[in-house]
Amino acid sequence: MKKFLALVLALVLALSLAACSGGAGYQIGIPADATNGGRALLLLQDLGILTLKEGVGLEATEQDIVENPHNVTIKAMEAANLPASLPDLDFAVINGNYASGAGIGDKVLTTEDAESVAAQTYGNVVAVKEGRE
């Protein structure tokens, strides 16, 4: 039996999301690699934090941001360093494996929708040998 599991991108809470509307220019850390950086930007768009160019999809980069109503600064960095960088950031979009490894699961605000394009494209598949279900 195969089960589809979405690779979790967790938006880790350092301050309340509502605080972003104050226009204080909060910093949000995202993974610097193209695959996870694009996924992070799509998640931020889904949360209403920013708007990306129409149709940019998973290839989204910081240059594709067309609206930034909360005046956030996107700070791209090595994905593995995001958990340790939380004290210097207001928020971070962190891959599930790094969030879990850092023991910050209690700070998860949201996760990527399992039906999203990103989850459908890059999700993990768990396969079990028949008879070992």
PLM regions with names:
Residues 1-9:
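Positively charged n-region of N-terminal signal peptides that target proteins for export
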Residues 25-66, 119-122:
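Bilobed "Venus flytrap"/periplasmic-binding protein-like clamshell domains
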